[in-house]
Design a protein with these regions (language model features):
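Short, surface-exposed, polar/charged, turn-prone segments marking secondary-structure boundaries
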Residues: 43-46, 63, 89-92
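Solvent-exposed alpha-helices and their adjacent loops that cap or buttress functional pockets
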Residues: 6-10, 53-56, 84-85
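Conserved mixed alpha/beta catalytic, RNA-binding, or beta-rich assembly cores of soluble enzyme
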Residues: 1-49
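Low-complexity, flexible helical/coil segments
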Residues: 41-43, 50-56, 96-97
């Protein structure tokens, strides 16, 4: 997985995580298209433990890919049924209010 933390004092850090094979690809389904860029998701490889630590402290979370989303599901941060599917790729956005 790749992990990038976007610091934000107003809303808490934005944590972006994507599965390795999705970086720098474009995923489409019907009218929705998402390009998974290293500018947003980073290019720093992260272990599952590093991803979990980052998610614990996040104000906002953006996840794309089976492994990335499953970590948040296992942590109880999101219900798998609430995740959007872009084709066969799960995507989740989690916001603290």
């Amino acid at each position: 997985m790749f992990l990038k933390i976007h610091p934000s004092r107003e809303t808490g850090d934005v944590v972006a995580v994507c599965d390795r094979e999705l970086l720098n690809t474009t995923i489409s389904h019907e009218k929705l298209t998402i390009t998974v860029t290293d500018a947003f998701y980073g290019n720093t490889p992260a272990t599952e433990a590093e991803v979990k630590a980052a998610l614990k402290n996040a104000g906002n979370i953006n996840l794309i890919g089976e492994r990335s989303v499953n970590i948040a599901v296992e942590m109880g941060l999101v219900d798998k049924h609430c995740c959007m599917m872009i084709g066969k790729v799960p995507h989740a956005q989690i916001y603290q209010l």
